[in-house]
């Protein structure tokens, strides 16, 4: 029987299935960070248990770490306690951790693939919703809660039911000036933030195959914003080449055996999905969110929508609240919206290709006078090192951007990098909820190139015609 990629990954990890469909699923890789792990480790200790398989765990502090003056340590006592607790727990149980001053430290969803700790065919979990990122590598990856973190530590398994399957097929050549970020924002604009609820999404089609592995990670990262718990892309030669020489990747005969298996990780011809969405890449333009949900998104050449034209009462009310929070008026051209801050980073867009794309726009220009701060935060120490080898840091610094240390940074208001009330930010992150980047902060989601262009222009511009 023809199987989807999701079927193959799921079936390969089912240890036991109950009559009601509840399955005991084996977990290959468990990624840990400082925010959702302390209570899990405490529960483990109180029960007198040890991690079932120490080597399956990899830890890194990312949410609370400072991206400036790191040598001075963490100023906030709660943030410092969370990071110190992760250090102590990993030392206690012998879990591999990339500590704050380790070159390999970075955002958990950047360092996992970067190290080859995430591999095709794996089940990958982390106490973080954007674990879906790792599905871009042909893995089944999803976020879990703190109690589940403890369960995985103790048993290397999870109890769960299989989701429905959805295929989002994107066909055609991606237009000039458009990126993976624009692809996924466009998709969310079509299906909404609940469109993928209850489903595992496989992204497929010539457009997805044309993306780099890092671009695919951007798309899968935001599968959760489409309502799905996981997103994935079939393995191809790009995937396999990506893992050659990675520290955790197999070598020698084991590499050959792994590659043989990885090449089976695709949906079979004739495999049936519960839902199929077809997207024409020719319809995609550079995207900008205007509201307080990723589904509130439009092409950059659009205008802020008018709630009075919305017939659905619930949607109209949501639009009105979003416009009030964002301080925007209906029918305002998106290119007329000025920005106060620019953030290039996050687990969505902080990899080397993202920084290169932003640097192309920033080269030889200056951050606009009305922009109070523009920062670039690499996704890991290794990404930062590579960018500096290529001279990208100099391009950004000469243009007036701040060049920071790796971490989650301004993606969320959990560290020193945050917006002040009323400040408007062009951000390459994944969520634009009220207060996400700081109480009263206003977030617009864009691609790295669009963010860099907004920094230079002082307002949103169409990167396709930006000079």
Curated annotation (Swiss-Prot):
SUPFAM superfamilies: Aconitase iron-sulfur domain (SSF53732)
Record has Cell cycle as a keyword: no
Record field: catalytic activity: (2R,3S)-3-isopropylmalate = (2S)-2-isopropylmalate
Entry's cofactor comment: Binds 1 [4Fe-4S] cluster per subunit.
Pathway terms, separated by semicolons: Amino-acid biosynthesis; L-leucine biosynthesis; L-leucine from 3-methyl-2-oxobutanoate: step 2/4
Residues annotated for [4Fe-4S] cluster binding in this entry: 347, 408, 411
EC code: 4.2.1.33
Cofactor(s) needed: [4Fe-4S] cluster
GO biological process terms held by the UniProt record: L-leucine biosynthetic process
UniProt-recorded Gene Ontology molecular function terms: 3-isopropylmalate dehydratase activity; 4 iron, 4 sulfur cluster binding; metal ion binding
Record carries keyword Iron-sulfur: yes
Keyword list, A-Z: 4Fe-4S, Amino-acid biosynthesis, Branched-chain amino acid biosynthesis, Iron, Iron-sulfur, Leucine biosynthesis, Lyase, Metal-binding
Role, per record: Catalyzes the isomerization between 2-isopropylmalate and 3-isopropylmalate, via the formation of 2-isopropylmaleate.
Family stated for the protein in its record: Belongs to the aconitase/IPM isomerase family. LeuC type 1 subfamily.
Quaternary structure and interacting proteins, as annotated: Heterodimer of LeuC and LeuD.
Family matches, as NCBIfam families: leuC, PRK05478.1, PRK12466.1
Name listed for the protein in its UniProt record: 3-isopropylmalate dehydratase large subunit
């Amino acid at each position: 029987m023809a199987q989807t990629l999701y079927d193959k990954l799921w079936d390969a990890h089912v240890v036991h299935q109950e009559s009601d469909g509840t399955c005991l699923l084996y977990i290959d890789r468990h990624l840990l960070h400082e925010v959702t792990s302390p209570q899990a480790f405490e529960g483990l200790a109180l029960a007198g248990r040890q991690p079932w398989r120490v080597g399956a765990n990899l830890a890194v502090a990312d949410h609370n770490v400072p991206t400036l003056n790191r040598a001075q340590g963490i100023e906030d006592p709660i943030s410092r306690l969370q990071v110190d607790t992760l250090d102590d727990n990993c030392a206690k149980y012998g879990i591999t951790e990339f500590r704050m001053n380790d070159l390999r430290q970075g955002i958990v969803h950047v360092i996992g693939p970067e190290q080859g700790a995430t591999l095709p065919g794996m089940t990958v979990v982390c106490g973080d919703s954007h674990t879906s990122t790792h599905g871009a590598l042909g893995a089944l990856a999803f976020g879990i809660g703190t109690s589940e973190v403890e369960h995985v530590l103790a048993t290397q398994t999870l109890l769960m039911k299989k989701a429905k399957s959805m295929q989002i097929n994107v066909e055609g050549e991606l237009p000039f000036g458009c990126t993976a970020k624009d692809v996924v924002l466009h998709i969310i604009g079509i299906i909404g933030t609940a469109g993928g609820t209850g489903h595992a999404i496989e992204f497929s089609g010539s457009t997805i195959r044309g993306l780099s592995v890092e671009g695919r990670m951007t798309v899968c990262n935001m599968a959760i914003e489409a309502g799905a718990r996981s997103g994935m892309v079939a393995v191809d030669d790009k995937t396999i080449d990506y893992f050659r020489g990675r520290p955790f990747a197999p070598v020698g005969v084991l590499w050959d055996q792994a590659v043989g298996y990885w090449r089976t990780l695709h949906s079979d011809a004739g495999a049936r999905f519960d839902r199929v969405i077809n997207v024409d890449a020719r319809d995609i333009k550079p995207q900008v969110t205007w509201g307080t949900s990723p589904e509130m998104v439009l092409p950059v050449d659009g205008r802020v929508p008018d709630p009075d034209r919305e017939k659905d009462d619930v949607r109209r009310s949501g639009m009105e609240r979003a416009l009030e929070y964002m301080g925007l008026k209906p029918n305002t051209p998106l290119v007329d919206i000025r920005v106060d801050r620019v953030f290039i980073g996050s687990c969505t867009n902080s990899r080397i290709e993202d920084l290169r794309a932003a640097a192309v726009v920033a080269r030889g220009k200056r951050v606009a006078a009305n922009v109070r701060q523009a920062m670039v935060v690499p996704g890991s120490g290794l990404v930062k090192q590579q960018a500096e080898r290529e001279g990208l840091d100099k391009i950004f610094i000469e243009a007036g951007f701040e060049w920071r240390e790796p971490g989650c940074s301004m993606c969320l208001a959990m560290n020193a990098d945050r917006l002040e009330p009323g400040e408007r930010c062009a951000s390459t992150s994944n969520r634009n909820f009220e207060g996400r980047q700081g109480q009263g902060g206003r977030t617009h989601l864009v691609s790295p190139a669009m963010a860099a262009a907004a920094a230079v222009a002082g307002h949103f511009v169409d990167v396709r015609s930006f000079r």
